[in-house]
Amino acid sequence: MLFSNNKIHAEGKLALIVGASQGLGADLALKLYQQNCSVILVARTETKLVAQIERIQSSSPENNATLSYKCCDASNYEDCVKLWNDLIVDQKQDPDFIFCCAGSSIPKLFSDLTAKDFAIGINTNYTTSLNITHTGFKQVLGQFSDLSCDQYKKRHVIFVSSVVSFYPFIGYSQYAPLKSAIQSLSIILRQEMGPFNYRVSCVFPGNFQSEGYEEEQKTKPSITKSIEGSSKPISGEDCADIILNQLNRGYDTVTTDFIGWLLGCSVLGVLPRSWGFFQVIVSFIFSIIAPIANYVVYRDVLKFFKTRSTREVEEYEIVSTDDNKKTL
């Protein structure tokens, strides 16, 4: 565990939250504001941002913190450059926390996905985080170029990956690889931005209730649901509470449930630890049982495709018979 004594201390600070028009980003904005932390909400859709501002303000009407929003397409690099220039140069606002929460999943079988689906996955789940972080870091370096590395103020970048980056499986080819890329990016930037007093954390949420989660259920293959199991998603606000609590305790690899923590033990690598001694033990156990678990999952996948193929043939035969009757 790195930065074990580095608590968030959100009160009186400023947070920039990208992807704050709904879901986890909006709930993190709510929780931070309730801790008297000023928040800038960033997303593309102004009407959604205004609605979130009203919701958050009504939760703590006597709060001294400020709430504002910026419309920005974080998948567009030049939009991000303009955002940071407006904040740091024009408005003299230098966020202490940068939460990269933009993301969406279209769970389908690989053969059912379209080029547009993949483009959305890349732009929303990876490019947004990359653009915001890179343009922000460049703006800070340019603005404070007269400072030595250790003189930069403390800043904190929080990436949101997913538990499926620990264990990717059928149905998530549009989503999981990009969340794995976020995990990898966080490791690299911990090295490259750390010398400039940036703390870099990566969050790996499990299922939580949100608008996005409801949309996922509409396209999610039955085999994907079967592998995930019937666990009930936690609320978005509970997820935000867990994340902020773990970050405040100094953890830079954050999971939101026990299953996520267990799966994280299977791919420890150079990730910052969370209960590291126990993770090493669980990791050893995983190295023994993982081949068996993979066999069981793959057996179910084979069964799914065989059943699916049989059903498609039967449906085709029924349609063909009906067409022949019409012809006669």
Swiss-Prot record:
NADPH binds at G19, S21, G23, R44, K48, D73. GO terms for molecular function: 3-dehydrosphinganine reductase activity; NADPH binding. The active site is at S161, Y175, K179. It is a single-pass membrane protein. Keywords: Endoplasmic reticulum, Lipid metabolism, Membrane, NADP, Nucleotide-binding, Oxidoreductase, Sphingolipid metabolism, Transmembrane, Transmembrane helix. PANTHER family: 3-KETODIHYDROSPHINGOSINE REDUCTASE. This is 3-ketodihydrosphingosine reductase TSC10.
